[in-house]
């Protein structure tokens, strides 16, 4: 069996988004399943819109997702000589020709076709003239006037397009640059690509590219056109649906394992299984079971998956992943050990690393930086609150065994001996030590913050009341 070779070919005119990442993942999995080769090609022929910064973020996003590529990255901008070589072959073999028609002439042809109720197109007036090269001319493919193009798509099944529906497409522009249709065929052939997975917005390109393959006598790869990803309202996916660049998900504290698991289910299934290890994905993904209906992006499902993966990680690993986020918040003095001590209180409450840092922030900051919202104070403070805080402070200061069990007992005894209910002191004590009204177990929170810091926080709120 011929070795399976796939590729991902983004254009560096923007960042890598969800749709592109899914295409890359499907192509990567197919290659890895068959122990094949996965290539990365940067289609940077649009010199005006292509930017190095976009190339950098695409590569960073791919690396973060773990979609490693084989061999050197191919840059289209460095392959012009090869494209011109192939164009010369097509001209010499009679499969392409020079066209000297002006833009105005071509627009007139199209308008005449529209008036006749026909598809607007170039009418092939230069097709048989055997014109020579012209600085203002273009090179066109001589599309067979009869027949059809048929290919079996991994997603859509058999697709057939009549040649009469196709134009004599431009292969080389008047400025001498090759068009996308020509460049992509040459690249895929030279890279020995056997399977091309891409968005179904490319379906109309495929018959044109197959005609170029046929003209050159090259083997045609297998195509799979996956449907676009829609928003939850079944409209075109956009930022308002929660979809952003892959790099932004990384910055928001999502895990690559969760992203991969989520992306693969947007257009592929394996029975009813929802959660996969990477090895399972490689084992199961063979190019079948690709969905023909568009998938809907659901940020809540992604958050749920991320929380699942986050909570399965060892505390030490989560702490390592959190360090950059903690540093970004300005906590340069916080150690990994400190993060590990606080983590167990909050990991079940957070969906992402960024949210985890946000929840832990009241514990990580010092008493001097802790603030209390006036609305929270008004909501829970009574005439007796300050007195309760004074007494509890003294009890906590005197407590030798600063452990959750003893702190819980201390609070319980205070409530019982003063004929109180927990709601009369619990919220004010929590607000004093953490700055917020909600959170984990109060006694565990107090212990994790530490006696010295807890006393300082109690003093701070007491003086504010």
From Swiss-Prot:
Q: What is its EC number?
A: 6.1.1.17
Q: Where is this motif: 'KMSKS' region?
A: 236-240
Q: Which residues bind Zn(2+)?
A: 99, 101, 126, 128
Query: What does the record give under GO molecular function?
Result: ATP binding; glutamate-tRNA ligase activity; tRNA binding; zinc ion binding
Catalyses which reaction? tRNA(Glu) + L-glutamate + ATP = L-glutamyl-tRNA(Glu) + AMP + diphosphate
Q: What positions carry the motif 'HIGH' region?
A: 10-20
Q: Which GO terms describe its cellular component?
A: cytosol
Q: Which superkingdom?
A: Bacteria
Q: Which InterPro entries match?
A: aa-tRNA-synth_I_cd-bd, aa-tRNA-synth_I_codon-bd_sub2, aa-tRNA-synth_I_CS, aa_tRNA-synth_I_cd-bd_sf, Glu-tRNA-ligase_bac/mito, Glu/Gln-tRNA-synth, Glu/Gln-tRNA-synth_Ib_cat-dom, GluQ/Sye
Note on how the cofactor is bound? Binds 1 zinc ion per subunit.
Q: Which Pfam families does the record associate with it?
A: Anticodon_2 (PF19269), tRNA-synt_1c (PF00749)
According to its UniProt record, where is this protein located?
Cytoplasm
Q: Where does ATP bind?
A: 239
Its keywords, alphabetically, are: Aminoacyl-tRNA synthetase, ATP-binding, Cytoplasm, Ligase, Metal-binding, Nucleotide-binding, Protein biosynthesis, Zinc
Q: What are the recorded Gene Ontology BP terms?
A: glutamyl-tRNA aminoacylation
Q: Sum up the protein's function in the record's words.
A: Catalyzes the attachment of glutamate to tRNA(Glu) in a two-step reaction: glutamate is first activated by ATP to form Glu-AMP and then transferred to the acceptor end of tRNA(Glu).
Q: How does it assemble?
A: Monomer.
Q: What is this protein called?
A: Glutamate--tRNA ligase
| Originating organism | Lawsonia intracellularis (strain PHE/MN1-00)
Lineage, highest ranks first: Bacteria, Pseudomonadati, Thermodesulfobacteriota, Desulfovibrionia, Desulfovibrionales
């Amino acid at each position: 069996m011929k070795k399976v070779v796939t590729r991902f070919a983004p254009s560096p005119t923007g960042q890598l988004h969800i749709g592109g990442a899914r295409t890359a993942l499907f192509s990567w999995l197919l290659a890895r399943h068959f122990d094949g080769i996965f290539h990365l090609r940067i289609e940077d022929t649009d010199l005006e819109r292509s930017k190095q910064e976009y190339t950098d973020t695409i590569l960073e996003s791919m690396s973060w997702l773990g979609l490693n590529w084989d061999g050197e990255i191919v840059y289209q901008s460095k392959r012009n000589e090869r494209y011109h070589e192939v164009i010369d072959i097509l001209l010499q073999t009679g499969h392409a020709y020079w066209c000297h028609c002006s833009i105005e002439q071509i627009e007139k042809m199209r308008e005449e076709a529209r008036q006749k109720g026909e598809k607007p197109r170039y009418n092939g007036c230069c097709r048989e003239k055997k014109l020579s090269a012209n600085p203002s001319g273009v090179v066109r493919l001589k599309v067979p006037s009869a027949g059809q193009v048929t290919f079996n798509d991994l997603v859509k099944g058999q697709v057939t397009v009549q040649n009469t529906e196709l134009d004599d497409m431009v292969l080389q522009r008047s400025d001498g640059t090759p068009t996308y249709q020509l460049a992509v065929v040459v690249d895929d052939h030279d890279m020995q690509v056997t399977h091309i997975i891409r968005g179904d917005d490319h379906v109309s390109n495929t018959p044109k590219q197959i005609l170029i393959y046929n003209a050159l006598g090259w083997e045609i790869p297998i195509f799979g056109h996956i449907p676009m990803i829609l928003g939850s309202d079944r409209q075109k996916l956009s930022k308002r649906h929660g979809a952003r660049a892959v790099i932004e998900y990384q910055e928001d504290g999502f895990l690559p394992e969760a992203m991969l698991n989520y992306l693969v289910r947007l257009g592929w299934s394996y029975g009813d299984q929802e959660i996969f290890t990477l090895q399972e994905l490689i084992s199961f993904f063979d190019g079948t079971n690709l969905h023909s209906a568009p998938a809907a992006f659901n940020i809540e499902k992604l958050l749920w998956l991320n929380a699942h993966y986050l909570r399965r990680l060892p505390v030490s690993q989560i702490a390592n992943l959190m360090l950059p986020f903690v540093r970004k918040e300005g906590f340069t003095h916080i150690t990994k050990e400190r993060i590990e001590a606080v983590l167990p209180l909050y990991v079940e409450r957070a969906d992402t690393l960024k949210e985890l840092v946000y929840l832990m922030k009241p514990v990580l900051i010092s008493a001097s930086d802790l603030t209390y919202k006036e609305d929270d104070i008004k909501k829970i403070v009574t005439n007796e609150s300050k007195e309760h805080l004074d007494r509890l402070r003294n009890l906590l200061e005197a407590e030798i065994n600063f452990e959750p069990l003893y702190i819980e007992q201390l609070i319980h005894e205070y409530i019982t001996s003063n004929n109180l209910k927990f709601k009369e002191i619990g919220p004010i004590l929590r607000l004093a030590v953490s700055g917020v009204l909600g959170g984990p177990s109060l006694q565990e929170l107090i212990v994790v913050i530490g006696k010295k810091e807890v006393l300082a926080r109690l003093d701070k709120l007491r003086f504010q009341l």
